[in-house]
């Protein structure tokens, strides 16, 4: 058996517990502030550029297993799409006109699709106000409803996704668990060739969900 940890806040306790009870310690994602040799196995994302080690497996996308919460239901004979909006960060700036042009394009190009949208804690009030101008069939504005996460429902029913490039976890989660077409919304970038761009490139080269079972068979515990 093993102790599995995911995220910077868990690695120390995983190491402590595994040593105390003589268990194998497995880290999901790259534990950058720790000695990699402290872990029996590390499962890291390729866009983090992990070094080659015997105890490290680099995978294209994050391990994830979303489940629908029932916020929306599949309507038979109706196609649907989801728009997932992030916001400014240290690399990207989200211009108002970029999102407006993309939303205009979506509503013009897909008039018969059901349209869903969700924002994030980084989405500006200006972008939230813009989203409110459109007639989405289902809408979650993070600043108003921070405790609702509809991503599992979107993954279960949507035929297309439009996701801003800054939203790496959402890009990874959707591609890992859905065969739907993913359209990445480009933003103004302060730097090039970052891990965000690397992940976007990986996703653009994939047209179906990831077979985690096949990949993880390489790990022997």
Regions found by a protein language model. Give the residues of each.
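Short internal beta-strands
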Residues: 42-45, 114-121, 183-186
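Short, charged/polar "capping" segments at the starts of alpha-helices
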Residues: 34-35, 50-52, 91-93, 122-129, ...
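Active-site donor-nucleotide binding/catalytic segment of nucleotide-sugar enzymes
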Residues: 64-125, 143-144
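Active-site and donor-binding regions of nucleotide-sugar-utilizing enzymes
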Residues: 1-57
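Active-site donor-binding acidic/aromatic loop of nucleotide-activated sugar
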Residues: 138-146
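Nucleotide-sugar donor-binding patch of glycosyltransferase catalytic domains
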Residues: 175-218
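A donor-sugar binding/catalytic signature common to diverse glycosyltransferases
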Residues: 151-193
